[in-house]
Amino acid sequence: MAYYFGYGSNMSQEYLEKVRNVYPTKSTIAYLKDYTLKINLKGPNFVEPGFANISYQSGSKVEGILHEISDLELKKIIASEGPEYEVSEITVYTNDKNFLAKTLIWPTDLLEELPTSRRYLNLLLKAAKKNGLSDDYIKEIEKKKAVYYPFLSEYYRIYAYFWVKSRAKKVNK
């Protein structure tokens, strides 16, 4: 069994199940102290220019979801996220406890934020609202810059779905 802290698309249980083939036994709101959410992981192209990452910032807080999953499911998340992220062990807090959990962080010196796709931003917002993250945190996510290109954005949404799903399926043990 593993604890995994999701702060981007992995806040969404629906996304974890349908795309990554990960079925958490329990999920709860949690937060990480002294980190901030940034869109500074460079995406593959101008249609998906940036993805969520977290970086150290004293006094800040990242809200997300703490998932209880199997070790195999953690491997699926790692494999389907791609090689840019590193697995980090962190302490996350819920209303009544703290947990040692794994999360993925892309080590970078890139401080400026990149735009993200409208598709990805909507995924983050839907997950944050559905899971009951704070209104202030949702407002911070809403401030992120997003891009949308008719046809190309829809095509890439389908491509990304199958790319992530195929990487998660390759993990069997």
What is each residue range found by the language model?
Residues 1-173:
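A glycine-rich, hydrophobic/aromatic-adjacent loop/helix-cap motif
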